[in-house]
């Protein structure tokens, strides 16, 4: 922001590219950084109140791999929630916007010319299907954290948009790059883990072992403020070395009043577990946090399927490369949303034309009573999460990845659902299986370690930077690829 005199666009670009491990698209990075001010002004106009000091100046925090304090925050440590609340309020007040709750998109309608014409949705409350035609379909469905045993993501982060787009023929990019946050609150029995913000380390907190000894000096010159992938692997290594379930974050060096004001949500959550962060060490461990890959798009959100757009974590613009710089995700969301909206205005969209066949014909396959009763997928979901954590997690190898793929193939047989499912949970699990295979397939093909993708059998980074691009038309293609037969599942694209 221009109000931040210690920062510059050039500095932000440099930090983003360095964190991206050689995969960030420079043109994308530059565009998003240069357009940050105007979207922040929009958020302010929408009612988002970013924190300010006693002189009414914005306050900025320091996060990992940033060279200066540049990250705005709201409500102390509730930035995402505050932005979401303001946007929901804005949307709810607009009578031109229809909101469908408890409704899940299950298929994109793509005609014979490879143009998206709409979507089939499933109402989880009534069990009924509906066809919605549209001249433009925008996917903004978030990430895939629920594929993993430990995650900071909400229960709905099951990769639904990625699976929808992939099944519709869209090109996927960099699906092997899953970011694991180094500091999630590690409480026994809790697998959906509460995020301990990087900003706590930015304010001076240190990572320590059970004896209170700092260890990050052994791993990187920036210590606690090294890029996320490095801090995550450092924490994991210390946990393995000490046969422990967590390391600790020591925030007792931060003024008590500052902790309470700057991190009210974290303070409250920790107190619920008997942890006073002004006095006690916080038990933390890595957890799946963010997907750098996704549906390949440009800045305007265009995918390889005409009429289909994607924004945010479900998209892959090339901004984050192999490792996302802290807080760039929110910035990307709002900048790209702004660009998609303005781009669609220029197209002078016409009312959508129905594809061949009646609505009844289109949803007929979902209406047949093929299955008698709903499957309880909770145990299969846990099984998948364990498979992905062990086989395609922080550390992976060809052996662990292929083993994971074989287990997922068996899960698909056990699940035995093709098109129709009987509940939201079944549809989500079907999508999770699809995305899991994408992650594994891409991770096997990238025979190097780069950013968040670390191979124990290929620990070095190749000299050549490339994006992986994934397309798949059938399950047999994946099997052929994993058997080292001729296949075009994964291709590559040079960095621009």
Predicted regions and their residues:
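N-terminal FAD cofactor-binding segment of flavoenzymes
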Residues: 1-50, 182-209, 213
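A short alpha-helix-loop-beta-strand transition element characteristic
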Residues: 23-26, 40-57, 98, 171-174, ...
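Short beta-strand to alpha-helix junction loop
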Residues: 24-34, 71-89, 100, 151-159, ...
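Glycine- and aromatic-enriched mobile tails/lids
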Residues: 42, 51-68, 111, 201, ...
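Conserved redox-cofactor binding core of oxidoreductases
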Residues: 44-128, 133, 140, 184-188
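FAD-site-proximal beta/loop scaffold in flavoenzymes
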Residues: 107-131, 275-317
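Flavin (primarily FAD) binding-site architecture
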Residues: 139-151
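An anion/pyrophosphate-binding glycine-rich loop and adjacent beta-alpha core
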Residues: 164, 170-282, 343-349
């Amino acid at each position: 922001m221009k109000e931040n005199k210690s920062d510059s666009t050039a500095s932000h670009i440099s930090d983003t590219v360095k964190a991206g491990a050689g995969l960030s698209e420079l043109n994308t990075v530059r565009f998003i950084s240069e357009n940050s001010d105007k979207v922040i002004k929009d958020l302010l106009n929408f009612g988002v109140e970013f924190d300010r000091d006693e002189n009414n100046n914005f306050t900025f925090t320091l996060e990992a791999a940033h060279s200066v304090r540049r990250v705005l925050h709201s409500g102390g440590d509730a930035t995402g929630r505050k932005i979401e609340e303001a946007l929901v309020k804005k949307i709810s007040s607009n009578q031109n916007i229809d909101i469908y709750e408890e409704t899940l998109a299950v298929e994109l309608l793509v005609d014979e010319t490879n143009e998206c014409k709409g979507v089939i949705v499933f109402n989880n409350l009534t069990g009924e299907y509906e066809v919605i035609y549209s001249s433009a379909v925008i996917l903004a469905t978030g990430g895939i954290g629920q594929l993993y045993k430990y995650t900071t993501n909400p229960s709905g982060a099951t990769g639904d948009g990625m699976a929808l787009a992939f099944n519709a023929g869209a090109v996927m990019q960099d699906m092997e790059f899953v970011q694991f946050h180094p500091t999630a609150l590690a409480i026994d029995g809790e697998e959906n883990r509460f995020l301990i913000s990087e900003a706590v380390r930015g304010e001076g907190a240190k990572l320590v072992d059970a004896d209170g000894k700092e260890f990050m000096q052994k791993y990187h010159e920036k210590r606690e403020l090294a890029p996320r992938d490095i801090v995550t692997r450092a924490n994991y290594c210390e946990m393995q070395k000490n046969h422990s379930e967590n390391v600790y974050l020591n925030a007792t060096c931060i003024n008590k009043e500052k902790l309470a004001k700057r991190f009210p949500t974290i303070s409250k959550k920790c107190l619920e577990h008997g942890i006073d962060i002004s006095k006690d060490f916080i038990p933390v461990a890595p957890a799946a946090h963010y997907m750098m890959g996704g549906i390949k798009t440009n800045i305007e959100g265009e995918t390889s399927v005409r009429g289909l757009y994607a924004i945010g974590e479900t998209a892959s613009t090339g901004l984050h490369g192999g490792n996302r710089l802290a807080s760039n995700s929110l910035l990307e969301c709002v900048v790209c949303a702004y660009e998609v909206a303005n781009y669609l205005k220029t197209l002078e969209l016409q009312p959508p034309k129905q594809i061949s066949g009646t609505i009844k014909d289109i949803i007929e396959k979902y209406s047949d009573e093929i299955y008698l009763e709903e499957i309880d997928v909770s145990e299969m979901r846990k099984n998948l999460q364990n498979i992905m954590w062990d086989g395609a997690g922080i550390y992976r190898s060809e052996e662990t990845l292929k083993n994971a793929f074989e287990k997922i193939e068996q899960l698909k047989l056990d699940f035995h659902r093709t098109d129709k499912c009987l509940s939201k949970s079944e549809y989500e699990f079907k999508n999770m299986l699809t995305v899991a295979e994408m992650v594994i397939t891409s991770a096997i093909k990238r025979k190097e370690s780069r950013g968040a993708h670390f191979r124990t059998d290929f620990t070095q980074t190749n000299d050549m930077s490339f994006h992986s691009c994934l397309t798949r038309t059938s399950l047999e293609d994946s099997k052929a690829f994993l058997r080292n037969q001729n296949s075009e599942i994964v291709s590559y694209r040079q960095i621009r």
